[in-house]
């Protein structure tokens, strides 16, 4: 089975008035939840971060009123910003976040290290 990645954004959005427009969303908290179930055991990891959206050069003709926003739209802005920041050398892309979660879950399923009792230790002191 493969790792399932689910992106979301918090429903608590930071807004401000800008360029004559009200309730401009300028900051959101995104979350990436990833999981895989193997032989009935579910392995998971979650990451989240607050990100500032680029609100430069807002166009009133294409501006979406706060009441009309959808989670998919705001999530798209967040993911676009994550990728744009990575392109400028700040952080990693969405695909790299997912790949990191893949690696983490693979290590949970097959730990690269183990804890073993030393050979000189005995069960009966």
Language-model features, listed with the residues they occupy:
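Acidic, low-complexity intrinsically disordered segments
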Residues: 57-125
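Short, charged/polar N-terminal "headpieces" of proteins
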Residues: 1-44
């Amino acid at each position: 089975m493969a790792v399932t990645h689910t992106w979301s954004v918090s429903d608590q959005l930071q807004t401000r008035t800008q360029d004559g427009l009200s309730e401009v969303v300028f900051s959101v908290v995104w979350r990436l939840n990833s999981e895989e179930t193997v032989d009935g055991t579910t392995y998971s990891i979650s990451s989240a971060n607050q990100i500032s959206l680029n609100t430069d050069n807002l166009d009133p003709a294409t501006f979406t009123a706060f009441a009309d926003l959808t989670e998919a739209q705001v999530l798209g802005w967040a993911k676009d910003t994550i990728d744009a920041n990575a392109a400028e050398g700040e952080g990693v892309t969405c695909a790299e976040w997912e790949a990191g979660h893949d690696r983490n879950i693979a290590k949970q399923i097959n730990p690269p290290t183990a804890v073993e009792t030393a050979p000189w230790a005995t069960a009966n002191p």
